[in-house]
Design a protein with these regions (language model features):
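Conserved, mostly hydrophobic/aromatic
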Residues: 1, 24, 54, 114, ...
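Active-site-proximal beta-alpha core segment in soluble small-molecule metabolic enzymes
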Residues: 22-158
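Active-site loop/helix belt of alpha/beta enzymes
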Residues: 111, 117-231
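C-terminal accessory subdomain/extension
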Residues: 252-356
């Protein structure tokens, strides 16, 4: 993990881009502090509740990357906002700014980042008139300052061919040109232009306007990302696997299958299946909430065909997770293995379940 943090920080610094890693991946203040120590300009969180955990732990700058749109959420923002740390909020609607105006105390100041969407269709505004209206209102209210803009094209991150991924990412940034022209016409500077991610970390550094990248999964990697091709290979090789889930072999219901005690409650199942690097010839199949089954590929359709799986009952196996972010949210803590290969302690996943 430390090597991944260092590699990303060095890469971004070499291209004169800021390092604003996303804590929705790890949900752990200890890891966030390590990222800040490596030169991060701040930490991203997906939700206000995650931001509360990070600010309470002493993180000095937090950007909430999902839009605020209700007064209840704005009240939560007001509760954590202070002049002792920088709190940046994403807004993409008049409704969201209305909520913040109604709830933020007069003696507090928060930065507003306008979320822009040109291709993904998840969050972000597209209309120029709404963009300008929000910009004007931000400048009129002393509790707010215009911090910049955000553009995240998450649907591009896992495009499997590097050149296709590169083409679509660059095109998505090109479509923001009109927004930058509007800012220039108003004489407004966007100090922050934030976005990008692990899948485009080596592409988006070439974007002139971009100030920092919101990389998240790079810190752990997962099987979904490992299957995405890199610039010069069919596997994503820029960062090492730094997160595994340990499962125990608990049963052998037939000669060609071994059951482990990790299922839907241990791994996020929205993507590919877990992979045991130590047994690459075996395939994992989910077998319910609490279990998974390892099989040889040729035994999947004919379970009686193969023996000699190389696993004994009681063996502890480590699996690369399918999708790191939601898998982390299933667990309470990280067991931390040091360079000597031994586990010397644990780190609480303090923002687990912070989904509001």
């Amino acid at each position: 993990m430390d090597a991944n943090i260092g590699a990303m920080a060095k890469h971004l610094a070499s291209h004169h881009k800021g390092f604003r890693p996303h804590a929705k991946t790890h949900k752990c203040p200890t890891i966030a502090k390590a990222q800040m120590a490596a030169g991060a300009v701040g930490i991203c969180t997906a939700k206000v509740s995650e931001a509360a955990v990070m600010l309470n732990a002493g993180i000095s700058s937090v950007l909430v990357t999902s839009p605020v749109s209700t007064r209840q959420k704005a009240q939560a923002v007001n509760a954590i906002a202070s002049n002792e740390a920088e709190l940046l909020l994403v807004v993409d609607s008049v409704v969201g700014l209305d909520a913040l105006e109604a709830e933020i105390d007069a003696n507090k100041t928060v930065g507003v980042v306008l979320d822009l969407d040109v291709v993904m269709g998840r969050t972000g505004l597209r209309e120029d008139d709404v963009f300008l209206r929000l910009l004007d209102r931000i400048h009129e209210d002393p509790r707010f300052y215009f911090a910049g803009v955000q553009h995240y094209a998450g649907h591009i991150m896992h495009i499997p061919e590097f050149e296709k991924r590169r083409e679509k990412s660059l095109r998505s940034w090109d479509r923001l040109a009109t927004k930058f022209q509007l800012l220039e016409q108003r004489g407004v500077r966007a100090d922050i232009v934030t976005g990008g991610g692990t899948g485009t970390y080596d592409i988006d550094v070439g974007i002139e306007h971009l100030t920092d990248l919101q990389v998240g999964s790079y810190i752990f990697m997962d099987e979904e990302y490992r299957q995405v091709g890199g610039a010069d290979s069919d596997r994503f090789k820029g960062f090492d696997l730094a997160l595994t889930v340990a499962c125990t072999a608990i049963s052998q219901p037939q000669p060609s299958a071994i059951t482990v005690d990790g299922g839907y409650k241990a791994f996020a199942s929205d993507s590919v299946n877990p992979v045991c690097d130590g047994l690459p010839e075996l395939q994992f199949r989910f077998a319910g909430d609490e279990h998974g089954v390892l099989l040889r590929p040729q035994a999947a359709d004919n379970p009686g065909d193969n023996q000699g799986l190389g696993v004994m009952l009681g063996d502890v196996l480590e699996f690369a997770v399918p999708h790191c972010d939601p898998t982390v949210n299933l667990h309470d803590q990280y067991w931390v293995r040091e360079e000597d290969g031994m586990v010397h302690g644990y780190w609480p996943i303090s923002a687990r379940g912070c989904s509001w």
